Amino acid sequence: MAIILGVDPGSRITGYGVIQCQGRHQIYLGSGCIRTSSEELSGRLKQIFDGITEIIRQYQPDEFAIERVFMAKNADSALKLGQARGAAIVAATVANLPVAEYSATQIKSAVVGTGRAKKEQIQHMIQQLLKLPAAPQADAADALGVAVCHYHTRQSLIALSGRATARTYGRYR
């Protein structure tokens, strides 16, 4: 049984999602957004770091997964996004959590089945997969998607390592 914290980084809005893995089941624990208010980038990065640190304190995750960013609107946006990712990763590292990174295509494929999925499709599938009463807001849904992607990757690695058994993880041959 593991708790996974997924993060969708952003310099203004950083989404987070927390799921618990019990065998082949994923249980929703919480999600939301860290909305930064400071005009100064350094202030926003501190808010992201502090927010992720508080979420880690509250949920006590075992693993941390974050979206890998490879493209942005312009160079300045890419730098700010990279710094936001760094603030979140440092918070996880300070808490001694293993960090996994996934591309947007990997996340969309794990959640929807296609790497070209739209935000609405991700929101809908997250709602279905985690049996939520309503679709989560876009940034939180993306973060939950990161956590779900990590769960699926983790399950695949367990199966490939030969540690899976029919009783705990289904049939892998």
From Swiss-Prot:
Keywords: Cytoplasm, DNA damage, DNA recombination, DNA repair, DNA-binding, Endonuclease, Hydrolase, Magnesium, Metal-binding, Nuclease. It comes from the Bacteria. Its main location: cytoplasm. It is found in: Cytoplasm. Mg(2+) 2 binds at E67. Binds 2 Mg(2+) ion per subunit. Its EC number is 3.1.21.10. GO terms for biological process: DNA recombination; DNA repair. One of its GO terms (molecular function) is crossover junction DNA endonuclease activity. The active site is at D8, E67, D139. Mg(2+) 1 binds at D8, D139. Homodimer which binds Holliday junction (HJ) DNA. The HJ becomes 2-fold symmetrical on binding to RuvC with unstacked arms; it has a different conformation from HJ DNA in complex with RuvA. In the full resolvosome a probable DNA-RuvA(4)-RuvB(12)-RuvC(2) complex forms which resolves the HJ. Belongs to the RuvC family. This is Crossover junction endodeoxyribonuclease RuvC. It comes from Shewanella sp. (strain W3-18-1).
